Regions:
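Core catalytic lobe of class I
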Residues: 1-234
């Protein structure tokens, strides 16, 4: 397993050498890793984020083995009146997927990771999740925001198939194959550091360890190189 801060680490890897990649990309404005200008989280807006992110996708296209997978963990992003001019949601997962598709990656899989809306309400005080909104103006009410693990496949003929034996029984496969993972512990993550910008909490994208375990278990062979471009922390 290898990790770095986006592209500099990837530039040292040989072509077609990585068996699998899994990470949580920086969410513009809301999440940050460091003060470095090379940190993708340190951007002014979504357009600047994707301009930077494009270089990473190009590197992933180069270093991934043909027929192998890249998984990214993400969520729809809340839009605020102060920052965006309206209250609503932004389709960040769709924007990420389309960015990968522009580089030739193939949309392969998507799983929804359930998150407790009560916990989200207590943490964010989002207008759409407050019970008082049901009474005062329920047109503004919405559901909680889940996480997603979206997987894309590098095109080309696979030279080494990923195979499993008795260690991957049918009951485990049925659990992993579910389109909704209900049993992911949201606090089982690698944490880096916290920071604050105005009154909004800026923290790293919390990719749960069990999500990493399932991706690696399903989509890798022993001794594969697994790349996490953001130090495994996202």
């Amino acid at each position: 397993t290898t990790g770095g801060t986006a592209t500099p680490e990837g530039e040292g890897l040989p072509d077609a050498s990585v068996g699998y990649s899994i990470f949580s990309p920086p969410f513009a404005s809301l999440y940050t890793y460091s003060n470095s200008p090379r940190d993708m989280g340190n951007v002014r807006d979504d357009a600047e984020l994707f301009e930077h992110f494009d270089f990473l996708i190009a590197e992933l296209r180069r270093v991934m083995k043909p027929g192998r997978n890249v998984s990214f963990h993400c969520m729809d992003m809340p839009a605020s009146k102060e920052r965006d001019g309206y209250i609503g949601l932004k389709d960040f997962p769709g924007d990420l997927l389309r960015a990968f598709q522009r580089h030739g990656f193939i949309f392969h899989a998507k799983v929804t990771i359930w998150k407790d809306p009560v916990t989200a309400m207590q943490r964010t005080k989002a207008l759409g999740l407050l019970h008082k909104s049901v009474r005062e103006n329920s047109a503004m009410c919405r559901m909680g925001i889940p996480d997603y693990l979206i997987t894309v496949r590098n095109p080309g003929e696979q030279e080494d198939r990923v195979t499993h034996g008795a260690e991957f029984p049918v009951d485990l496969w049925q659990k992993v194959a579910s389109p909704v993972w209900m049993d992911i512990n949201p606090s089982d993550t690698l944490q880096f550091r916290s920071a604050r910008e105005h009154d909004d909490e800026r923290h790293i994208c919390p990719l749960q360890l069990d999500v990493i375990r399932r991706g690696v278990m399903l989509w890798t062979n022993p001794n594969d190189i697994v790349l996490s471009p953001f130090m495994g922390i996202g």
